[in-house]
């Protein structure tokens, strides 16, 4: 079985480990003008398809990916909030309030929530998308608590080769199969252990 679909021949280093034939496809970006895409970058659905509608989905880095949003409401006393997203991408969770002094709790990428703001702590189960957060101070009455995350269903694949997205409108993507050890990246940095587990759940090892 030939696992390569509509691939354009890469000119440099590849992400795919071809000892186990991967499934690779050419995927359109949602629009031009993004930063450079590195080999091994985890790619996700963007906010829209390309103008020609030749692609059924777009691909972009996590920073520009389409995110799912859930909300809760403060009552002035409650500090603990729970959200259920379904599978989410490790490292993508953020929870904020619209208090006069906004509170923000971010994803540490290891199943815990916190970040640098010290606004609160919590946990996230990436496979189920269950999120529990406890703020250090209760959000004010009627103020909104907004949780955002990249849904697991929005994952497209791994960039098989590097490109300048300001000049190119698409990228060769590893959709399934083995990739070279240490090549996977999330927003330009080496993928974490939880992100590698996420890739494994989606058929990329």
Regions found by a protein language model. Give the residues of each.
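Extended beta-strand solenoid/passenger and fiber regions
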Residues: 24, 59-121, 126-150, 184
């Amino acid at each position: 079985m030939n696992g390569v679909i509509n691939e354009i021949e890469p000119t440099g280093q590849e992400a795919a480990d071809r000892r186990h034939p991967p499934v690779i496809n050419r995927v359109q970006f949602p629009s031009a003008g993004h930063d450079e895409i590195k080999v091994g970058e985890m790619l996700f659905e963007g906010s829209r398809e390309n103008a020609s509608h030749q692609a059924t989905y777009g691909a972009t880095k996590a920073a520009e990916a389409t995110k799912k949003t859930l909300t809760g409401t403060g009552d002035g006393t409650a500090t603990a909030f729970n959200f259920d997203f379904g599978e989410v991408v490790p490292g993508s969770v953020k929870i904020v309030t619209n208090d006069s002094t906004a509170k923000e709790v971010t994803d540490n990428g290891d199943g815990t929530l916190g970040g640098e703001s010290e606004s609160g702590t919590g946990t996230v189960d990436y496979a189920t998308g269950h999120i529990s957060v406890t703020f250090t101070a209760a959000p004010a009455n009627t103020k909104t608590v907004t949780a955002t995350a990249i849904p697991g269903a929005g994952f497209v694949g791994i960039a098989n080769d590097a490109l300048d997205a300001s000049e190119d409108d698409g990228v060769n993507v590893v959709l399934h199969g083995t990739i070279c050890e240490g090549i996977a990246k999330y927003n330009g940095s080496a993928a974490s252990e939880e992100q590698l587990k996420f890739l494994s759940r989606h058929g990329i090892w």
